[in-house]
């Protein structure tokens, strides 16, 4: 049995509350770059009291042109790998990190469904990218994960928020 949108959202609120509390206590800032979630990650964080000490901003970059112009995703990356790929998710996260000068950035790009997708990445597939400043302040640490969830559009998007918040929590844990 799959969780309902309401159940997923309640879980996301708990994750966001933990992130805001821990990031605020450490003076760590967060930013987002969102495509399929269209601002849901930033909104979930912003719903928590005290988020203004943590959330630097979020970019909704639904189309490829804006991913390129706002976040600096290379056109070659979009052409070669598509907007729904590890490479694009990583470049989106780095773009958010630089744009907002945050300590941690997370990105989400994918196919929420019910249509769209490819044979390799069907509807319900998304990529979460994350980037954070290295301990020595040098080149950012960047990674991504591919996820797939069956369900309606709203649940796929809510699961993407869960995965993104989980990556922020993961990075916060690594900073302890």
What are these model-derived regions, one by one?
Residues 1-176:
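Short alpha-helical segments enriched in small residues
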């Amino acid at each position: 049995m799959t969780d309902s949108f309401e159940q997923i959202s309640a879980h996301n609120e708990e994750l966001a509350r933990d992130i805001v509390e821990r990031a605020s206590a450490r003076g760590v800032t967060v930013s987002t770059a969102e495509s399929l979630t269209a601002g849901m990650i930033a909104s979930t964080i912003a719903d928590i009291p005290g988020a203004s000490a943590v959330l630097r901003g979020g970019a909704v970059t639904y189309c490829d042109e804006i991913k390129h112009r706002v976040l600096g995703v290379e056109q070659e990356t979009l052409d070669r790998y598509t907007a729904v790929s590890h490479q694009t998710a990583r470049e989106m996260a780095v773009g958010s990190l630089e744009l907002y000068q945050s300590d941690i950035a997370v990105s989400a790009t994918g196919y929420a469904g019910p249509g769209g997708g490819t044979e390799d990445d069907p509807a319900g597939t998304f990529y979460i990218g994350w980037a954070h400043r290295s301990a020595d302040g040098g080149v950012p640490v960047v990674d991504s994960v591919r996820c797939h969830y069956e369900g309606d559009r709203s649940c796929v998007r809510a699961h993407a928020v869960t995965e993104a918040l989980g990556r922020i929590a993961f990075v916060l844990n690594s900073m302890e």
